[in-house]
């Protein structure tokens, strides 16, 4: 009878860390391999093969693979949002530009602070005529002809990820769903996220940005997870049961099957960092340390959190870099600075480090 081995893998922007546990003997083996940013699944599978080789076992002995990833985190932090568009209610085109009045701590009313670029520039924001009141009643009907024109406008410009946030859609999602249907019909290659699916709450700015983050990471996370799942199934084909169970860590510390991740990619935005905090919480519990400040410094980003009474701190008011991400998550402060971050000189002459990283390449 073969051994039963569980494998956990954390993929960062620079390194991939792997740990394997023999369920019978309790043997634990860990190793590390460079990540492969051009195709992260290659580094993932290299790590699986490497740790199993260290244990001297076959792929058929795998019972479960759990994965924490910073693919979404690093994509968001490095700030290249080309190919992302935004659709909103007519008259609300500037919702991202207005944003909030807050400025980074330490700047106050300093004249030299420059407002950062928006996640979607104004020229890639389109409006559709429609309007719901605060109770979800239709004030202005959804203009399907205008929606078709907008969908084709994005298609013709190669914008393949679009977030949709209509006013008061958290009460009544009908108009957003119709916009999604139009996009799917007119622009079949487009990844679409609608705010009524992603964040069904009031506050247009936060809802818009959270939806855009979901749309931005959706193709990256979906392709990444699908690629890993396919290769993992091939690798573990000797199981004879169609593959090994594959789970992905969520930002709130839970796990989700690979099949579900494609529809809710934003839940993985702090996947890797959340796993690190859970590990630190376990160490704090065993060592009877309280409270504990955790710091997880990788090659691309650095994550800091607090553990109290052996429990991670949770929040629904989180942020990744400068973007609010209002989904349940472990309360982690993430900055785009790590061991491989690239230094550069800003327009004001100041020396900056990150968020771009040399990565593993």
List PLM regions with ranges:
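N-terminally biased helix-coil "hinge/interface" segments that flank
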Residues: 1-361
């Amino acid at each position: 009878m073969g051994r039963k081995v569980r494998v956990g893998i954390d993929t960062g922007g620079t390194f991939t860390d792997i740990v394997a546990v023999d369920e019978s003997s309790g043997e634990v083996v860990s190793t590390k391999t460079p990540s492969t940013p051009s195709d992260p699944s290659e580094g993932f599978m290299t790590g699986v093969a490497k740790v199993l080789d260290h244990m001297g076992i076959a792929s058929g002995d795998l019972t479960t693979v759990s994965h924490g990833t910073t693919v979404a985190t690093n994509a968001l932090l490095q700030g290249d949002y080309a190919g992302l568009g935004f659709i909103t209610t007519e008259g609300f085109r500037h919702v991202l530009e207005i944003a909030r009045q807050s400025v980074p701590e330490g700047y106050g009313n300093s004249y030299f602070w420059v407002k950062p670029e928006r996640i979607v520039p104004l020229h890639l924001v389109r409006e559709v005529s429609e309007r719901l009141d605060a109770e979800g009643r239709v004030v202005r009907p959804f203009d399907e002809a205008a929606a078709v024109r907008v969908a084709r406008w994005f298609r013709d410009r190669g914008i393949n990820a679009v977030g949709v946030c209509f006013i008061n859609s958290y009460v009544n999602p009908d108009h957003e769903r119709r916009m999604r249907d139009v996009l799917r019909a007119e622009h079949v290659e487009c990844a679409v996220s609608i705010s009524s699916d992603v964040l069904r709450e009031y506050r247009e700015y936060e809802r818009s940005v959270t939806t855009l983050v979901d749309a931005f990471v959706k193709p990256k996370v979906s392709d990444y997870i699908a690629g890993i799942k396919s290769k993992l199934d091939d690798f573990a084909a000797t199981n004879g049961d169609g593959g090994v169970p594959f789970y992905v860590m969520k930002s709130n510390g839970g796990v989700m099957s690979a099949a579900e991740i494609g529809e809710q990619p934003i839940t993985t935005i702090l996947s890797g960092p959340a796993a690190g905090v859970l590990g630190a919480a376990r160490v704090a519990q065993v060592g009877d340390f309280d409270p504990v400040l955790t710091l997880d410094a990788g090659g691309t980003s650095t994550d800091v959190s607090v553990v109290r009474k052996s429990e991670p701190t949770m929040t629904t008011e989180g942020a990744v870099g400068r973007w609010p991400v209002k989904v349940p998550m472990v309360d982690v402060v993430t900055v785009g600075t790590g061991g491989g971050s690239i230094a550069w000189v800003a327009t004001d002459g100041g020396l900056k480090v990150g968020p771009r990283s040399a990565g593993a390449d």
